[in-house]
Amino acid sequence: MKPVLLMIVNDPAFFMSHRLPVAVGAQQAGFQVHIATRPGEAVKKIVSQGFLHHELPLSRSGKNPFSELYLLTYVWRLLWRLRPDVLHLVTIKPVIYGGIAARLAPVKGVVAAVSGLGFVFMAKGLKACAFRACVAWLYRRALGKKKLRVIFQNPDDRDALIGLGAITFEKSVLIRGSGVDLTQYQPAPESPETPVVTLAARLLRDKGVLEFVEAANILRQRSVPAHFQLVGDLDPGNPTSIEPSELERWRSEGTIECLGYRQDIASVFARSHIVVLPSYREGLPKVLVEAGVRL
């Protein structure tokens, strides 16, 4: 009987872009690979790879306690049904709920990947502090299993969770980023045309989108030749998402070009002179690694 790997990731598209090679490697090593995500167009691609998919009742930023309890119960039941040899948890909610459920289920080992601590650790005010304390308490419960390791992409996030008492240093592993397929991203000659400055990210305030637009306005006022382009989609499920009206205003002002979501990001970077990500909190951004290879 094949050993079982269960990967729980919030978004199917994120799995395809950041964790697919891990699942393929496990499959080639003889594991039966299960992927649990919320619904999305990329689920078809997951199934086409030969993985078994499970649909999670997951709202990435939902705060309804009944919905959250239902999600926790669903994950717990899934763990009892599959009894995975390895449970790989990726991003905040899967790490928290999967980690808690794993302490109450027959799971042999857990690998949690913290790619960033998110807006919860940046927000200010009394409400934000209370919510942050709640999340810290959940992390301590989620990461308490003995046979568990936590992958961090930078030492700051690792030190933050150690400082909260969520894990010990011995349980932490530092791996800087998700890596890049070098066959898809190769160096390209720089164009002599007007410099193109690109920000590729989900259109969130904590990704630095407002700062990017402000920088474009400043250079425009100073008559500095530069073409600013924004690549990415709005993220209505995230409380820091840019509003559609803001995006439309930027389009009408002509300060920046809004390209929307693009699958051909390698070709976008090939036409760029500068790639920026003025984000407030990240693990180690894959987009900058991709740009570093391409530019």
Where are the regions a protein language model picked out?
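A short hydrophobic beta-strand element within the catalytic core of glycosyltransferases
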Residues: 7, 275-276
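Nucleotide-sugar donor phosphate/pyrophosphate-binding loop at the beta->alpha transition
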Residues: 15-18, 66-73, 108-111, 119-142, ...
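Conserved nucleotide-sugar phosphate-binding/catalytic loop shared by glycosyltransferases and other
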Residues: 29, 33-70
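Glycosyltransferase donor-sugar binding loop
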Residues: 37-41, 200, 227-242, 258
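Donor nucleotide-sugar binding/catalytic pocket of nucleotide-sugar-dependent glycosyltransferases
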Residues: 54-57, 132-187, 196
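Conserved donor-binding/catalytic core segment of Leloir-type glycosyltransferases
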Residues: 189-207, 212-217, 228-229
